[in-house]
Amino acid sequence: MARTPDDSWDLASSVGATATMVAAGRAVASADPDPLINDPYAEPLVRAVGLDFFTRMLDGELDLSVFPDSSPERAQAMIDGMAVRTRFFDDCCLAAASAGVRQVVILAAGLDARTYRLPWPDGTVVYELDQPDVIAFKTQTLRNLGAEPAATQRPVPVDLREDWPAALRAAGFDATRPTAWLAEGLLIYLPPEAQDALFDTVTALSAPGSTLATEYVPGIVDFDGAKARALSEPLREHGLDIDMPSLVYTGARTPVMDHLRGAGWQVSGTARAELFARFGRPLPQDADGTDPLGEIVYVSATLAADA
């Protein structure tokens, strides 16, 4: 089903199911013999959602040959891809904390459990924004698990298409303090104009010294929906019915790094291959050639004092 301006979802449908997919990837990556990350909450959260495909994946009952262009190397690259992505955002959080930032905002938090699993300094407050059903499910599931947040947690149940800055302020957010912003796995699900508006709003809410971590997909401009559907057909046959072409917004959009620089941020970008190399993970030479999304660039930014 195509996106609409007022569509909504839970963690088993639409955009929400992609959050469950990402959490399943974190669970598998955490169980890797040589793990880059440790997310002990990913597996129980995914099991609680109850999507059979991901449950079978966690149980080891899913033949990895069902994945597009599968091979042992590609299967490992998928696991490593989620590991390096997670590690990048973890490291951005910890770097901001080391620099004295004590206010964190996770946009479209999904099943992100960083509030619970990262070693936050005393006094850190983490705001988690997402659809009300998503926030309620994750909060209750982690409570049922007996999980304790490692920072002061402020769930903010709000759609990012609504007045989320007002909801954030109502939860206690202080725009005069530096903030670490995370927008992980979000931008492709925003129309181009909404992406620009998001960054402009983040900038307006950011004090000097604030940081931002995100990633973008240059190939979203000419995303090949037919190729994506063809590659995912074997997954549908095994019960995973996530139609990415109907969930993402394609077409020309303002380059992320250019937009942020123009707003006063000091920006650096890291290509996926470079990130794999940083963490000692091999990347198949033609990985981007078989991925309909293509390259991924990971972005870290700091707001300059004179922005």
Swiss-Prot record:
EC number: 2.1.1.-
BP GO annotations: methylation
Keywords: Methyltransferase, S-adenosyl-L-methionine, Transferase
PANTHER family xrefs: S-ADENOSYL-L-METHIONINE-DEPENDENT METHYLTRANSFERASE YKTD-RELATED, S-ADENOSYL-L-METHIONINE-DEPENDENT METHYLTRANSFERASES SUPERFAMILY PROTEIN
Domain of life from the UniProt record: Bacteria
Group of enzyme by EC: transferase
Gene3D superfamilies xref list: Vaccinia Virus protein VP39
Pfam families named among the record's database cross-references: LCM
Protein name (Swiss-Prot/TrEMBL): Putative S-adenosyl-L-methionine-dependent methyltransferase Mflv_5025
GO MF entry, a single one: methyltransferase activity
UniProt cross-references to InterPro entries, sorted A to Z: Ppm1/Ppm2/Tcmp (IPR007213), SAM-dependent_MTases_sf (IPR029063), SAM_mthyl_Trfase_ML2640-like (IPR011610)
Protein family per UniProt: Belongs to the UPF0677 family.
Cited function: Exhibits S-adenosyl-L-methionine-dependent methyltransferase activity.
Keyword Transmembrane: no
UniProt KW rRNA-binding keyword: no
Residues binding S-adenosyl-L-methionine: D130, D159, L160
